[in-house]
Amino acid sequence: MELYIVRHGETLWNKEKRCQGTIDISLNENGRELARITGEALKDVHFDKIYSSPLSRAYETACLIKGDRDIPVIKDDRLKEVCFGNMEGMCMDDMLKDPDSHFQHFFDAPHLYVPDENGESLEALCERTKGFLVNELMPEADSL
């Protein structure tokens, strides 16, 4: 099995350096163009299926990469971005400067990252995505 992992295209919040997490922000025009370019680069690659987060930025990216090929695009909640809870929508630069913020730990010391009361722990994120890998990909894999 060959597995291609592609990140979604750019959104307005990416450009503004805002924390997105599970808030459903659509692609901007540059993000759509980047997804089309990626689709063009992958046009000769055979895909049996495309899996996507149900968030519109990821699903739209997947559909633009697929183009007019007859390939199912399957939405799966387990592929959503990590939930940053109350930090979603906030300016990342501000959070990274705040010495009391756990946000920086997410990137440089994940073992110290503590989500807020509405956020998702890295352990929960790993369990969620592991469930996707084990249940969806491993049964079909010769080896992964």
Where are these regions (language model features)?
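Extreme N-terminal starter segment of soluble prokaryotic enzymes
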Residues: 1-4
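Short amphipathic alpha-helical segments
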Residues: 17-18, 62-66, 138
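Short, basic/glycine-rich phosphate-binding loops at helix/coil junctions
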Residues: 15-18, 101-114
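Phosphate-coordination/substrate-recognition cap region in phosphate-metabolizing enzymes
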Residues: 37-103
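A short acidic, helix-capping loop that chelates divalent metal ions and anchors anionic groups
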Residues: 14-15, 82-87, 113-117
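A short, acidic, amphipathic alpha-helical segment used as a generic capping/interface helix at domain edges
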Residues: 129-137
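Loop-to-helix element that buttresses phosphate recognition and phosphoryl-transfer chemistry
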Residues: 10-60, 116-130
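Glycine-rich phosphate-binding loop signature in dinucleotide/nucleotide-binding domains
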Residues: 44-46, 136-144
